[in-house]
Amino acid sequence: MEKKKRRWGDRKDGVLLRDLDGMHFITPLIYPNRCDNEAYIRETIDLTNMNAYLKKKNESETEFPYTMFHIIVAGLVKTITLRPKMNRFIANKNFYQRNEVSMSFVVKKQFADEAAEALAVIHAKDESNVESIHEDLRHQILDCKDVHKVDSSTDNMDFFNHMPRFLGKFLVWILTRLDIHGWIPASIIETDPYYTTCVISNLGSIKLNCGYHHLTNWGTCSVFCIIGEKSKRPVYHEDGTIEMREMLDLGLTIDERLVDGYYYSKTIRLLKKLLENPELLETPANQEVEY
């Protein structure tokens, strides 16, 4: 994304939108809280082509095999790069365009009740594609799974947890004030998952069906994506035949104040096209596709 000279009113992580229409100017003034403006979208993805694509990619990639999760992350990156209004956020009743496309997710260090979790963030570029994102995910996931390492977000939370309770509450209150005005430290913006474009939760990896996750008034994240558990379902063809195919549900929670329903509809159509035709993700994120 092209960097612009920072002007008065801009934030470290976003550019103030100064040319909004009247409706979008008024909306955050009368509906100021992100969590009060959640909308929910569910989309079903046919995994036939993705499964074949993964099989082909993993013929040569054995050390860190490509997975469905990697394809979905790459699909979200390309979708939001091509649909930039999805990368807006509202803070202090103002609209901002985020400076970059970023994704965050939780990594379970081990599949055990008492195992710790780590928070991972990837920062995409206009030229990012499925291969470069796969490499970013490799570094992030392997680093997070190291039981001897603590990610910076978790380390910060532990720091507050070890303080006297009254002091921790006071400092967090200070941070919420800074958050409102965009004065939060850059180190937090870089590593806090709720300052990213989209938070992704792969519930299917722990055998849960697709659901929805709330947004938060802390941070700037306007999109949350839940990945469900894949399953076989009937597909009915026009000639009357029935075929069982592997399907996947995605549950998206979005800030409905950002754009209108038509923009969201076209965005979901693009995401579905990319995930059902994953070879398109080998092109740079900013390269247009027909959908």
Predicted regions, residues:
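C-terminal catalytic/motor cores of large multi-domain enzyme assemblies
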Residues: 1-291
